[in-house]
A protein has these predicted regions:
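Feature activates predominantly on carbohydrate-active enzymes
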Residues: 76-86, 90, 124-317, 347, ...
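Extracytoplasmic
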Residues: 711-755, 857, 863-865, 870, ...
Length: 1001
C-alpha cells in the first residue's frame, strides 16, 4: 500500500490571505502575521485554503449573505483587530469574493463599554467577560449587525459564532444571539516533550518543540490557537506532565514566551506542566519539600520570572506521586501542601494550579482481592476537601481508571464540595483506536457531563459541578488532552470532530453530540443534507461499534496495557501491579467492587448512586463487569448470558466497522476528492482490524471458559487457510505472543524468528522479562500468559513497569502450553446455511507433489461479519527492534541477494468469483512486499502491495495484524494460490492466513 499524501506531509498552507481595507487603516494583517503591533503592515491577497483550516475552511454558500460585508471596529485592541480580520476573511470566502458592500450597511464590533459610548441611548445588558451579544437592526435603507462583547475576547467568540452559523447556511435574520461559556476553564493539555515527541500522540511531531527547544516556525501554533478560539477554548497547557523540569529553565521559558505571543491574538493563554521536584532538579536546592522555606522562595522567584516574560500566563498543571513522578509524599506531605505552595506563588499574578487527581500505586498486589486502583483518587483527595487554596483546581479524570472505552464516572466529582474541580478527558484516542479507528467520543463525554452524582440527595450533574455551580466555586472547567501534531492535527481527518466537540461541550455542555456532529460536518465536509446525514450517522455509531468489538460490559480496556494500549492483549491487564484487572478465570469474569464482598469502591458514591451499583441486578449491563465478578452463565437484563453476549457483541461490532466503509463509499463524488481518498483506506483498515479484535477476544474467552458460542462462530473459521499449514518455501512457523493475536496462535515469518530475550531500554536499564506463567484452561491444558515485557507506544514514549515490579505466578500454577496452540472447534455443529467453501483438512497435492491445504467446497456458513474489507493505513511511529543489534537484523533480514518466501495453498471448492483476504503482520522499520498469484499469474493490480504502514509493536502481534483484500477473483477446483513475500529491513513479511470470501460489488 502506498503512503497517503497526508501521511507524508506536514501541515502546510497554514493561513489563507485576503486583501482587507477599512477606514483609518490602510491594510490589516493576515492571521499568519501572528506578531501584532499597534500599526501592522503585512497586507496580502486572496489565496486558496487548505485542509489545515479544518472546520474554518470556509466555502462559498452559493447564495447572498444575510449580513453586511463591511466590518467596523470601535476599539483597537489586539483581540478586536483579530476579530475584524477573522470576520472579513470569513465573509469573503463565504460570499465567494463578493465585493465589500458600500454605504451604511455594517457589522459593528465592540465591547459593552465601547458600544455604550457610541450609542448612549441604547440599553445594553451587563455581560460577563466571555459573554457576547449578536443583534441585527434593520431600517428602510440600512442594516447593521452589532457584535457586543463583555471583553475583547468575547467579541472574537461572537465573530466565530456568526461565521459558524453562516457557514452552515443559517441566516441570522432578526435573531438575537446571546451566549456565555458554561465554565471558566476550557483548556487543552498537550503532552509534548522537549525533544519534539508527543506522549500518546498519534499525529507526528510537536508543533511547539524540537530537539530541546521551542521551534523557530510558530505559524502552526497561531493557526492552532485560531482553531481553539473558534470553539471557545481559552487555554493551552503546552508540555507533558512527565519529565517537565526542563521547561522551567530560562532558555526554555524564553521560547515559551514566543509561543504565548503566537497564541495571544486569539485569547488562548498558555500554561505549563511542572515537576514538583524542580527546585532540586534545576534549582540547586537539596530538597523539594513543599513546606521548606527555601523551596517556597524558589517557586515564588520562578513564577515572578515567568510573568516577567509572559504577563498573561495562566498557571501550572501538576502530576505528582504517580507512575514514577516525584511528589510531596516523599516528605510525608499531602497534595494540598504541594498545591498550596504553588498556588501561593501564582496568586499575586492571578495564576491557577491544576493538580491532577491521577495519583495511584502502580505496584498493587494483584493477589489481594481488596486492592483496587479505582479507589485511589477518592481515598487520597476526599479527606483533603476544603484544604486547598482558592486558586487550586483538582483535575479529575472522567473515570476512575484511565480513559477507557467505558468506565463509570469518577466518584471524586461528588466527593469534593469545598474544592474546585475540572474534568479531564482525552481527545487523543489512547485506548480508543489511536486515530486509526474512527471513534467519535462526544457521546461518551456527554454521558459523563450529564451523570447525576446525587450529592446529599440533590440533583448534582457533573456538568454543574465542574462549572462551579453546584458548590458555589469561582473556578472549574474541562481539560482535554489533545495530542495534536504536525500530521493533519490529529492524524486522521474525521478525528478532528473530537477536538471540535470538546470545545463545543466545554462552551455549552447542554449541546447534543448529534447536533455537534452535524455542525462539524457542515463546516468541514459539506452542507449537502445526504452527506450530513451519512457522516453524522457514522460518527454517532462509531463509539458503540468500537466498544462492541473491543471490551463491552465494562471490561475496561483489553488492549496491550503494558505496551502500546492499542491492539488486544487480554492477559496484559492481569497479574501485575497496574490495577486494570478484569479478574477473568475459568468460571467467571469481572471485578467485585461492592461494599458487601468486594473492594468497597461502590461506597465512594452517594447512597443514591451506590444502591444502583451495589447489586448486579440493578447495575447497568454496560458496566456490569466493572462492578461485579459474575459467572459466564450469569444472565443480563435481556436474558442473554455474559459469555454469549461477549461472543455476539464482537460478531455484531465488526460488521458495523465494515459498514463505515460502505457509508463512506456512498459519498464518492459528493465530497472533496482528496478527503475521500484519504479516509477510505483508514476505514478499510479499521474494518480489518475489527476482525482481529473479534477473533482475539472470542478465542480467548472460548478457551478460558470452555463454553462454546451458541452460533458456532468463535474459534471456527470455515473459509480460512492458515499460513502454517501451507506449503512453505523459506518461510518458518513461529508462535505468536499472545497466542490469541493470530488466527490459531501461529504465523509464518520470512527470516529467523526474533530473539525476545530482555533488551536494554533506551536509558540503559533493563526491561523486565516476559511473565510466562500460565492460567489453567478448562480442558486442563495451560493458557499462555501475557508477554509483559515493556514495549514503546507508537511515539516511543512508553513507560515500562519498574524492573522487578512484576508479580510471580502462584506456586503450583500450570506450566504454559506452546503459545499459539490451536483451538478446538466448538462442541456444537455449525448450522448448515450457505455454500461457501470450507476446509476439509485433507491435504491437496501441489505441482511438486507436496501437500497443500485445500478448500473442499462443502457447505458451511460464513461467519457473521466475516466478509469485511480492510487494508493497511496508519501513521509512522517508532519502536524497539526484535533483534539484538543492527548486525543481527542485517544478517537475519537482509542477506546478500533478494530474499523471498512463498506460501502455496490449493483451492478445491466450487467455481465462482470470490475475494481473497490476506491477513499479515505489518511490522515497523521496513516495507515488506507481498504478491498474490493464481496458478502463476497475478490476477489484478490489487494483488501486489507493500506493508508500508507503521503500527505499534516490533514483532507479530494484533497491534500490527492487517488485512488486504483482492477483489473479483475467479476460482475453480484445483487452482493454486501463492503468496510471495519479500521482507524489508525489520519487516519480515509475516503471514497469518488467507480467507476466501463471497465476492462483493
Amino acid at each position: 500500500m502506498q503512503h497517503r499524501a497526508s501521511e507524508r506531509r506536514s501541515i502546510q498552507g497554514w493561513v489563507p490571505q485576503v486583501s482587507i481595507l477599512r477606514p483609518g487603516i490602510r491594510s490589516l494583517p493576515g492571521i499568519g502575521c501572528f506578531v501584532f503591533a499597534a500599526v501592522l503592515q503585512c497586507g496580502f491577497v486572496l489565496s486558496a485554503q487548505t485542509a489545515a483550516q479544518a472546520w474554518l475552511k470556509y466555502r462559498p454558500i452559493g447564495k447572498p449573505l444575510s449580513v453586511p460585508t463591511r466590518v467596523s471596529t470601535l476599539g483597537q485592541s489586539l483581540l478586536e483587530q483579530t476579530a475584524a480580520i477573522e470576520l472579513r476573511r470569513g465573509l469573503l470566502y463565504l460570499s465567494g469574493s463578493t465585493p465589500l458592500a458600500a454605504g451604511p450597511n455594517t457589522i459593528l464590533l465592540g465591547t459593552v463599554q465601547e458600544m455604550r459610548a457610541r450609542q448612549p441611548k441604547t440599553t445594553l445588558p451587563t455581560l460577563e467577560p466571555d459573554e457576547f451579544l449578536i443583534s441585527a437592526k434593520h431600517g428602510d435603507l440600512t442594516r447593521e449587525v452589532d457584535i457586543t462583547g463583555g471583553s475583547d475576547r468575547a467579541i472574537l467568540y461572537g465573530v466565530f459564532t456568526l461565521l459558524r452559523n453562516l457557514a452552515q447556511g443559517i441566516d441570522l435574520g432578526e435573531a438575537v444571539i446571546r451566549e456565555r461559556p458554561a465554565m471558566p476553564i476550557r483548556w487543552v493539555d498537550e503532552w509534548d516533550n522537549a525533544d519534539g515527541s508527543i506522549e500518546r500522540g498519534y499525529a507526528g511531531r510537536s508543533i511547539f518543540f524540537d530537539d530541546g527547544h521551542v521551534r523557530e516556525d510558530l505559524a502552526p501554533v497561531a493557526e492552532y490557537a485560531r482553531l481553539l478560539a473558534s470553539t471557545g477554548i481559552n487555554g493551552c497547557n503546552l508540555n507533558n506532565v512527565n519529565n517537565a523540569a526542563v521547561f522551567l529553565t530560562p532558555q526554555m521559558l524564553e521560547g515559551v514566551a514566543r509561543i504565548a505571543e503566537a497564541m495571544r491574538p486569539y485569547g488562548v493563554r498558555v500554561s505549563l506542566s511542572v515537576d514538583i521536584a524542580s527546585p532540586q532538579k534545576i534549582g540547586g536546592i537539596a530538597t523539594f519539600d513543599p513546606l521548606d522555606p527555601a523551596v517556597k522562595k524558589w517557586w515564588a522567584n520562578k513564577v515572578d520570572e515567568i510573568y516577567a516574560l509572559i504577563p498573561d500566563f495562566s498557571g501550572f498543571t501538576v502530576k505528582a506521586d504517580s507512575e514514577g513522578q516525584p511528589g510531596p509524599a516523599s516528605f510525608g506531605r499531602t497534595p494540598a501542601d504541594a498545591a498550596n505552595t504553588l498556588a501561593a506563588a501564582l496568586a499575586p499574578h492571578n495564576g491557577v494550579v491544576l493538580y491532577r487527581a491521577f495519583v495511584y500505586n502502580h505496584h498493587l498486589d494483584w493477589r489481594d482481592p481488596k486492592a483496587d486502583r479505582a479507589r485511589a483518587a477518592y481515598d487520597i483527595f476526599h479527606p483533603l476537601d476544603g484544604k486547598f487554596a482558592s486558586n487550586v483546581i483538582i483535575q479529575t479524570k472522567e473515570g476512575p481508571i484511565d480513559f477507557q472505552a467505558r468506565e463509570p464516572v469518577s466518584p471524586l466529582f461528588g466527593g469534593l464540595t469545598q474544592t474546585s474541580q475540572a474534568m479531564e478527558l482525552q481527545i487523543t484516542q489512547e485506548y480508543t483506536g489511536q486515530q486509526r479507528h474512527l471513534v467519535y467520543l462526544a457521546p461518551m463525554w456527554k454521558q459523563v457531563l450529564d451523570f447525576d452524582m446525587r450529592v446529599n440527595g440533590a440533583s448534582t450533574p457533573v456538568k454543574q459541578i465542574v462549572a462551579g455551580k453546584s458548590f458555589h466555586r469561582d473556578l472549574g472547567g474541562i481539560v482535554g488532552v489533545s495530542g495534536i501534531g504536525q500530521q493533519a492535527w490529529l492524524g486522521s481527518p474525521l478525528a478532528l470532530a473530537n477536538l471540535y466537540a470538546f470545545g463545543r461541550l466545554a462552551w455549552d455542555p447542554n449541546l447534543t453530540p448529534e447536533q455537534i456532529a452535524e455542525e462539524w460536518t457542515r463546516q468541514t465536509i459539506s452542507t449537502n443534507p445526504a452527506v450530513v446525514r451519512t457522516v453524522t450517522r457514522m460518527l454517532m455509531q462509531s463509539w458503540p461499534a468500537y466498544e462492541s468489538y473491543t471490551g463491552p460490559l465494562g471490561l475496561q480496556t483489553l488492549t496491550d496495557i503494558t505496551g502500546s494500549h492499542y491492539g488486544p492483549n487480554i492477559e496484559s491487564s492481569e497479574n501485575n501491579g497496574w490495577g486494570q484487572w478484569h479478574r477473568a478465570d475459568h468460571d467467571g469474569v469481572g471485578m467485585d467492587r461492592t461494599v458487601a464482598t468486594g473492594t468497597g469502591f461502590v461506597g465512594q458514591y452517594s447512597p443514591d448512586v451506590a444502591k444502583n451499583y451495589e447489586s448486579a441486578s440493578t447495575t447497568p449491563d454496560n458496566l456490569l463487569l466493572f462492578f461485579h465478578h459474575v459467572p459466564y452463565t450469569y444472565k443480563l437484563h435481556d436474558g442473554k448470558t455474559v459469555i454469549q453476549y461477549l461472543y455476539d457483541s464482537h460478531y455484531d461490532g465488526a460488521p458495523q466497522a465494515a459498514q463505515f466503509v460502505d457509508d463512506w463509499k456512498s459519498l464518492k463524488g459528493r465530497i472533496d476528492s482528496e478527503l475521500y481518498a484519504d479516509m477510505l483506506p483508514r476505514l478499510q483498515y479499521q474494518a480489518g482490524h475489527a476482525i482481529v479484535w473479534r477473533d482475539a477476544v472470542t478465542q480467548y474467552f472460548l478457551k478460558l471458559s470452555g463454553i462454546p458460542d451458541q452460533q458456532g462462530r468463535a474459534g471456527h473459521y470455515p473459509n480460512r487457510l492458515e499460513a502454517e499449514d501451507a506449503r512453505l518455501t523459506a518461510y518458518r512457523v513461529i508462535d505468536v505472543n499472545p497466542w490469541e493475536d493470530a488466527s490459531h496462535g501461529k504465523a509464518v515469518y520470512c527470516g529467523p524468528a526474533p530473539d525476545r530475550s530482555p533488551q536494554p531500554a533506551p536509558d540503559g536499564s533493563a526491561l523486565p522479562a516476559p511473565d510466562r506463567s500460565a492460567l489453567p484452561a478448562p480442558d486442563g491444558s495451560a493458557l499462555p500468559a501475557a508477554d509483559r515485557s515493556a514495549q514503546p507506544s507508537p511515539n516511543g514514549s512508553a513507560q515500562p513497569a519498574p524492573v522487578g515490579s512484576a508479580q510471580p505466578a502462584p506456586v503450583g500454577s500450570a506450566q504454559p502450553a506452546p503459545v499459539g496452540s490451536a483451538l478446538p472447534p466448538p462442541a456444537q455443529p455449525t448450522p448448515d446455511g450457505s455454500a461457501l467453501p470450507a476446509p476439509d483438512g485433507n491435504a491437496q497435492p501441489a505441482a511438486d507433489g507436496s501437500a497443500l491445504p485445500a478448500l473442499d467446497g462443502s457447505a458451511q456458513p460464513a461467519p457473521v461479519g466475516s466478509a469485511l474489507q480492510g487494508s493497511a493505513s496508519s501513521l509512522k511511529g517508532t519502536g524497539f527492534s526484535p533483534y539484538k543489534n543492527s548486525q543481527e537484523k542485517k544478517r537475519a533480514l537482509a542477506p546478500e541477494g533478494d530474499q523471498s518466501c512463498t506460501a502455496d495453498f490449493a483451492y478445491k471448492g466450487k467455481a465462482g468469483r470470490f475475494k481473497i483476504a490476506v491477513q499479515y503482520f505489518d511490522l515497523q522499520g521496513g516495507a515488506a512486499k507481498f504478491t498474490l498469484s493464481l496458478n502463476g499469474q497475478q490476477p489484478n493490480s490489487d494483488a501486489s502491495w507493500s506493508a508500508d504502514a507503521t503500527l505499534p509493536t516490533p514483532h507479530p502481534h494484533a497491534d500490527n495484524s492487517t488485512r488486504h483484500i483482492i477483489h473479483n477473483i475467479a476460482l475453480k477446483s484445483g487452482d493454486t494460490i501463492r503468496i510471495s513475500a519479500n521482507p524489508d529491513a525489520t519487516d519480515p513479511a509475516a503471514l497469518d492466513y488467507i480467507e476466501i470470501l463471497p465476492a462483493t460489488p
